[in-house]
Swiss-Prot record:
UniProt GO molecular function: cysteine-type endopeptidase inhibitor activity
Family statement: Belongs to the protease inhibitor I71 family.
Record text on subunit structure and interactions: Oligomer; probably composed of 10 monomers.
Main location: secreted
Compartments (UniProt record): Secreted; Cytoplasmic vesicle, Secretory vesicle, Microneme; Cytoplasmic vesicle, Secretory vesicle; Parasitophorous vacuole lumen
UniProt entry keywords in alphabetical sequence: Cytoplasmic vesicle, Host cytoplasm, Protease inhibitor, Secreted, Signal, Thiol protease inhibitor
Gene3D superfamilies for this protein: 2.60.40.2020
Protein's name according to its UniProt entry: Falstatin
Cellular component, GO annotation: cytosol; extracellular region; host cell cytoplasm; microneme; transport vesicle
Motif BC loop, residue range(s) on this chain: 284-294
Superkingdom of origin: Eukaryota
């Protein structure tokens, strides 16, 4: 019985071996034992054609009752694969590398672009164009919408070297009107007396900055100024902004400590009354080493809509200066400073003498992460009115996780 099985197996192997000569996808079956494995391995490693191998214990194939004592033999099934080293033409056919190509001899610099590379390139352009159309559509909807807008990075770089304005970077989209570049981060309503952050460019600046963009319609990082609605004449207001800039060393007329840090996404509004040219110091608790930073996100005339997903993904370090109000970005309090007092409004209201916050979360003490520290931001209003100053304690690389937002509603008389 075993002899008959072996003969049938040998005959099948011969048939498969003969078909492999003409078929590039054929299989081969071989019995491998201690006396033959070295020769088979040598032939495999010396060969140039790629193979796919499967090994099955031969004693199980030969006799499932394991009556055969030869337990060291295995059945090796190999499959020839297509030679991927040969190039592929545009019709997805393999080009024989042995054929002579006279065109390559005439032009050594010519390269054959396969169908796969061209498809990927076309899909990349389509994807970029689709994303660009979605951005333009979203911006047009926001321009025509008078509802509240999400808070995001309101800072921008100065187009000239005038340091009277705040500087930063942001990505902007070039629309049909080359004299007006607007982004969802900078759009404000024209009817609700909010600050309007529209970046203005002339044709020459845009043409020079578009330069070497790879995908049509994309504009590199642009530099722009911040303008408020009241600044109809930006050139005239530049001198006023210089005089309105807040000195970081200016003494505090009033000291406020904002609410406690909570381990979840939350938002809190603190109402404060002040007077013109009165310096209000905001003390902010911070925990070192956890990636969270206190950031000044904006100044508004109406309460903005808070959306952490639109927060800047890069750390903002700029302060805010305008003819109406000046606000410094939070910075660490010097060790010898006397601004860390206990006469804070929130300290009295929230009971800061306890070791836990009103939400039963531990306060940032020395035993937490890398220790606690105190930051300070100074606010100086130059004109009466109501202002909403937005601070946020969040991770720039993960703005939607445990973001603490504090909005100072400042009523200036």
């Amino acid at each position: 019985m075993n002899l008959l099985v072996f003969f049938c197996f040998f005959l099948l192997s011969c048939i498969v071996h003969l078909s492999r000569c003409s078929d590039n996808n054929s299989y081969s079956f071989e019995i491998v034992n201690r006396s033959t494995w070295l020769n088979i391995a040598e032939r495999i490693f010396k060969g140039n054609a790629p193979f796919n191998f499967t090994i099955i214990p031969y004693n199980y194939v030969n006799n499932s009752t394991e009556e055969n004592n030869n337990k060291d033999s295995v059945l090796l099934i190999s499959k020839n694969l297509k030679n991927s080293s040969n190039p592929v033409d545009e019709n997805n056919h393999i080009i024989d590398s042995t054929k002579k190509n006279t065109s390559n001899n005439n032009n050594n610099n010519s390269n054959i672009v396969g169908i796969y590379e061209s498809q990927v390139h076309e899909e990349k352009i389509k994807e970029d164009n689709t994303r660009q159309d979605n951005i333009n559509k979203k911006e047009n909807e926001i321009i025509n919408n008078n509802h509240q807008i999400p808070v995001s990075n309101i800072f921008s770089e100065n187009i000239d070297n005038n340091k009277n304005y705040i500087e930063s970077n942001y990505k902007s989209t070039y629309n049909n009107n080359p004299e007006l570049i607007h982004s969802t981060d900078f759009i404000g309503s024209n009817n609700n007396h909010t600050f309007n952050f529209l970046s203005r460019y002339n044709n020459s600046v845009l043409n020079n900055m578009q330069g070497n963009t790879k995908v049509p319609g994309n504009v590199p990082e642009l530099k722009a100024r911040i303008f408020s609605e009241e600044e109809n004449t930006e050139v005239e207001s530049a001198e006023n902004n210089h005089t309105n800039s807040l000195n970081p060393n200016e003494s505090c007329d009033q000291i406020i400590k904002l609410g406690d840090i909570i381990n979840s996404v939350n938002e809190k509004i603190i109402s404060i009354n002040s007077t013109v040219n009165n310096v209000l110091c905001i003390n902010l608790d911070s925990v070192n080493g956890n990636g969270f930073v206190w950031t000044l996100l904006g100044v508004h005339k109406k309460k903005p809509l808070i959306d952490p997903s639109n927060f800047p993904t890069k750390r903002v370090t700029q302060s805010y200066v305008s003819p109406d109000i000046s606000v410094t970005n939070p910075v660490p309090i010097p060790k010898n400073s006397n601004t860390n007092k206990d006469d804070s409004i929130n300290n009295k209201q929230d009971g800061s003498q306890n070791n836990t916050t009103t939400n039963h979360f531990p306060k940032p003490r020395e035993q937490l992460v890398g220790g606690s520290s105190m930051l300070i931001s100074k606010i100086k209003p130059h004109k009466p009115g109501k202002y909403f100053i937005v601070y946020s304690y969040y991770r720039p690389f993960d703005p939607t996780r445990d973001t603490n937002t504090r909005i100072v509603e400042l009523n200036v008389q």
